[in-house]
């Protein structure tokens, strides 16, 4: 049993639809525990830094603009194989390709406003968690 942590962001489109609770229910029903959470409105600088890996991609400026268009809910999820499990319940990046019953298939509008972000690997998860949270902000709930 591998207990992992991963970063999840509920994006501005999903926050605006008032479906945070529905998404949290999906995390919990999948065996993931929320061990840290906060709502914030990303500044342009924060969004640029967080998504710097995409800075040379054609969608970068639109992504930064979207992520700063309204508040986001940022959380750390913990559980067995949390990274893969979260990515599975999120669904494909493009909601048109997402399996029915996944967060993106059920709630996302399009590939740009796709409801959620999740870390794609253990190194990325650690880096992304540290971007938003200090270690003392995380409350382990193993048990």
From Swiss-Prot:
Which keywords, in A-to-Z order, does the entry hold? ATP-binding, Cytoplasm, Kinase, Magnesium, Metal-binding, Nucleotide metabolism, Nucleotide-binding, Phosphoprotein, Transferase
An example GO CC term for this entry is: cytoplasm
Task: Kindly give the SUPFAM superfamilies that the UniProt entry links to this protein.
Answer: Nucleoside diphosphate kinase, NDK
Q: Which reaction does it catalyse?
A: a 2'-deoxyribonucleoside 5'-diphosphate + ATP = a 2'-deoxyribonucleoside 5'-triphosphate + ADP; a ribonucleoside 5'-diphosphate + ATP = a ribonucleoside 5'-triphosphate + ADP
Question: Any keyword Transferase?
Answer: yes
- What's the short name of a Pfam family annotated to this entry? NDK
The entry's protein name is Nucleoside diphosphate kinase
Functional summary from the UniProt entry: Major role in the synthesis of nucleoside triphosphates other than ATP. The ATP gamma phosphate is transferred to the NDP beta phosphate via a ping-pong mechanism, using a phosphorylated active-site intermediate.
**Gene behind this chain?**
ndk
Localization per record: Cytoplasm
Assembly mode:
Homotetramer.
GO terms of molecular function: ATP binding; metal ion binding; nucleoside diphosphate kinase activity
Q: Name one GO biological process term.
A: GTP biosynthetic process
Record's Gene3D superfamilies? Nucleoside diphosphate kinase-like domain (3.30.70.141)
* Species: Nitrosococcus oceani (strain ATCC 19707 / BCRC 17464 / JCM 30415 / NCIMB 11848 / C-107)
Sequence positions that bind ATP:
11, 59, 87, 93, 104, 114
């Amino acid at each position: 049993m591998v207990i992992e942590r991963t970063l999840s962001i509920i994006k501005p489109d999903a926050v605006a639809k008032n479906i945070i609770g529905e998404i949290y229910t999906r995390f919990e029903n999948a065996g993931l525990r929320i061990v840290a959470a906060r709502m914030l409105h990303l500044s342009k600088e924060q969004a640029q830094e967080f998504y710097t890996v995409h800075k040379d991609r054609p969608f970068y400026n639109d992504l930064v603009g979207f992520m700063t268009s309204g508040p986001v809910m940022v959380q750390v999820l913990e559980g067995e194989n949390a990274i893969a499990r979260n990515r599975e319940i999120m669904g494909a990046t493009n909601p048109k390709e997402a399996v029915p019953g996944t967060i993106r298939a059920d709630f996302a509008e399009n590939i740009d406003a796709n409801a959620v972000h999740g870390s794609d690997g253990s190194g990325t998860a650690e880096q992304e968690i540290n971007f938003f949270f200090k270690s003392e902000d995380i409350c382990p709930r193993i048990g």
